Amino acid sequence: MKKFNFRKVLDGLTASSPGSGSSSGSNSGGGAGSGSVHPAGTAGVLREEIQETLTSEYFQICKTVRHGFPHQPTALAFDPVQKILAIGTRTGAIRILGRPGVDCYCQHESGAAVLQLQFLINEGALVSASSDDTLHLWNLRQKRPAILHSLKFNRERITYCHLPFQSKWLYVGTERGNTHIVNIESFILSGYVIMWNKAIELSTKTHPGPVVHLSDSPRDEGKLLIGYENGTVVFWDLKSKRAELRVYYDEAIHSIDWHHEGKQFMCSHSDGSLTLWNLKSPSRPFQTTIPHGKSQREGRKSESCKPILKVEYKTCKNSEPFIIFSGGLSYDKACRRPSLTIMHGKAITVLEMDHPIVEFLTLCETPYPNEFQEPYAVVVLLEKDLIVVDLTQSNFPIFENPYPMDIHESPVTCTAYFADCPPDLILVLYSIGVKHKKQGYSNKEWPISGGAWNLGAQTYPEIIITGHADGSIKFWDASAITLQMLYKLKTSKVFEKQKVGEGKQTCEIVEEDPFAIQMIYWCPESRIFCVSGVSAYVIIYKFSRHEITTEIVSLEVRLQYDVEDIITPEPETSPPFPDLSAQLPSSRSLSGSTNTVASEGVTKDSIPCLNVKTRPVRMPPGYQAELVIQLVWVDGEPPQQITSLAVSSAYGIVAFGNCNGLAVVDFIQKTVLLSMGTIDLYRSSDLYQRQPRSPRKNKQFIADNFCMRGLSNFYPDLTKRIRTSYQSLTELNDSPVPLELERCKSPTSDHVNGHCTSPTSQSCSSGKRLSSADVSKVNRWGPGRPPFRKAQSAACMEISLPVTTEENRENSYNRSRSSSISSIDKDSKEAITALYFMDSFARKNDSTISPCLFVGTSLGMVLIISLNLPLADEQRFTEPVMVLPSGTFLSLKGAVLTFSCMDRMGGLMQPPYEVWRDPNNIDENEKSWRRKVVMNSSSASQEIGDHQYTIICSEKQAKVFSLPSQTCLYVHNITETSFILQANVVVMCSSACLACFCANGHIMIMSLPSLRPMLDVNYLPLTDMRIARTFCFTNEGQALYLVSPTEIQRLTYSQEMCDNLQDMLGDLFTPIETPEAQNRGFLKGLFGGSGQTFDREELFGEASAGKASRSLAQHIPGPGSIEGMKGAAGGVMGELTRARIALDERGQRLGELEEKTAGMMTSAEAFSKHAHELMLKYKDKKWYQF
């Protein structure tokens, strides 16, 4: 007996009501509304045949790992026993690094900048001081660190912290010059305070300034060295509570470091000098040097230099000490880069850096400050890089960094993410890329080797591809939540280098970064790789293991089209689409080759933006350029940037489009098959009756005004924002911009995994793009999209001339954001936003599948173009390919973003592909060779009838059509108040689903083909442009986005991966015995000073020091224990962890009970003793003696 489905009854009732397919409302958060439609009787049959296995229990959103260099770093710390490194940032983030695979990200909820970090050495804890004057204690003994305690200072600002080795008391210096002491275990302030007016001499009337240094003496832990900004240093006796000695210097102090014997210390000053002080003669420096100052005549002071911001004085047992400092260069060398100076004996080595130095630390063999330090490396934290210098070799080489700290080497402009790739790809790419690695690194192992990490159970090959502003492409191995660079491709090598002065003549669309990558398409199976750049070019690459020297083939395409500005009908009104399959004339095919002619003073025509190399080029193994396609200038108009891209290795065809039209190129025969304006694709069935016209002279100016007036109501400072350069997205000052405004700024799209995902226009390719629109002379738009974006039309309108404030004001008018249908949406210019190759049904009456190209536009229109390929394999290299619009039209609300197809059983159909073969393998070329094309097995053996689903997603809704009948089976209005930025059809647990990322921050998952909502989570309440332009989904529940200019954030929407995440993360803390201190020897202990320890608890505890004022600091309990349980519960050891915590809590309560019992017994004994004494006292007295 067949199971009764009540939902189908409701769906049938819904279908019978008018407008049921598109009238569903949106939720309160601007998320999803839904409606289902099945107009034809066949739909109900198909729905019964498909058993959807996905349920909402399969989905959950969770951040997994963050890769890249910490954005805007501010602080650095190192645990010499655990060998882990911590980096704090200006945004309140902390990154903790260990061995490769051990990479943890933490975030302060307040978002305040991290001022300083201090490890509790070998105890699995970290103290952070933030700019909101709060101290935090982090527990590192769990995979997801959490805050245990916080201490908020209310009346003083924190400037410096110091935690002695194996001490439980933290010294905290403040801006007022006072020094407070905090108990690390309880995070409570001690009553012991060193006031600034008691530390300095009574005769001194001026304030010494903030505390810039605190450290205890290596010889005597009872003595504290306090450095003040104005040049005063105080040696404070903690026991006697008085200053033992004071040091005064004319120049401000930046840092201080001890000699390990505790008899001398070194200071760095603002005049570029280093002073060495001896405790026995504090009246003047024992030695004063200006390392980079010019030597003057006798009697004159050396020339002052730039401040030395930090100095470290490290001793060696068998060699001269190391003096390492940053800064201190001479002022006359203004052009010199930031440097780190290493002084070892008489040798002075200056290491120049590419970026300003934020902080550095010397790594030493021992954690004990009173032993020979034996430094072996220096960690240098730069503004945009992290390097480690090997001190054990005389030439001071750097270590090869195993972390992906160079993602931002050139600003990232687009990303692509591929999960479950062919397993041999990673090895192949690595073997090619390793040959091009830099040489000269240290041969020692990476010194930051702490923590523990294993692969985990859930591993499959994953590859991330990033496109960059300099035209480079990087392939990354992203398997097992790690990231390692495999291979780097430089696309700029196919072009001639621009000579000085040539840029304005031929490349006016972009002055800076003309090679910036917009879109990426990659077919892992065929290894075909294709990119489009900001200068309106497309390059097709083929992979080869052999080096070749050959000429680069190039084609030039004219793709410039204009129409009359006729107001279009409302997008909600779906016009009729007649079947024109029988009456369409043959398509117009334009020759793609043109002669490049340019002369000064003549209107530019048929000139590409870049010049392809004409001489033979040596191409190393890896990806080698097969064909370069460039759009050219037409009648003085620059080519529009490409907004959509798709490649089919099986068909040997590449298609791309922009706001003017569509171009289709045969990259096997190197010929242009189609170069047509968007209107011509409709032919006689143009729904909006637009007429072609010749290009107008002031087109760009009109477009500028037209778009500006619609945007001026959204943001008052729009003119300035629209003209921000492309680098504004990738600079370090990353200021969020409202996405609703961003919607109006980006007409192009982003593509991932062969499908498009973009805010307004999109194409079927695998990557994201940085879109077009030239603004005046500067035309560098942020990673992935152009400067503005239209909701329903004209997604690629150019902006080339500036708009004055008066013009902007005149053209502006008031309208609500909800009414997206306005004049800006009704322009007749229609951009190609999505492309997709698939074997499908081009027309209604087709009975067999054939090669097709699906074309989506910014007006929500979908056109199917039929591809007629030669039948015989040998003829494919000689016979022409016919390209013909089929006359089939489908419509949606909003710009089309992505396509996909499913078979009648609900299986996701993959486009056909050609099996990879090395094009330069001599052995294979000698044999008779035929192209081996892999077709989708399910699509190749289907019977006649409605047996293919086509999934189409736009900015507003998703629809599922049955082909060839073109019946709309399902429609889902995803959002009404917002719009979709990224969409992709992905595989999850062997089933297909539609994943969407909305401008309001919602991530939504829908099952296919029914489009039932599976997940709707408000993941990013405060989104910004960078996230919107780089967000991409892939299979197996994975996604990523560029969270900052230097970091990639990966997340999962898979419940299974969320459950197993704890097992995949690395351990930050591993049990290691603390090394024993060296034996000082009898004589050294006798004459070397009082090196014995003293009881800090007795000195700083409440019993002797009293309680601190409650108004001075506020203790805030942290969520560490709760977070620790949540983190442990996610792994296999969750139950054991909970049991252990319960036992610990029970043991703690029993311990407290035992203490109370012991206290009561003590009290009882005291009472008994007192009663006995009282009895003895009055035992022999008479009654009258009382």
Swiss-Prot record:
Positions of the UniProt region annotated as Disordered: 15-40, 748-771
Tissue: Detected in kidney, hippocampus and lung carcinoma.
Topology term for the membrane: Peripheral membrane protein
GO biological process assignments: exocytosis; Golgi to plasma membrane transport; protein transport
Gene Ontology molecular functions: GTPase activator activity; myosin II binding; syntaxin binding
PROSITE patterns the UniProt entry points to: V_SNARE, WD_REPEATS_1, WD_REPEATS_2, WD_REPEATS_REGION
Domain of life of the organism encoding this protein: Eukaryota
Ranges of compositional bias, category Polar residues: 748-769
Binding partners and assembly: Interacts with STX1A and STX4.
Name by which UniProt lists this protein: Syntaxin-binding protein 5-like
Organism: Homo sapiens
Species classification: Eukaryota, Metazoa, Chordata, Craniata, Vertebrata
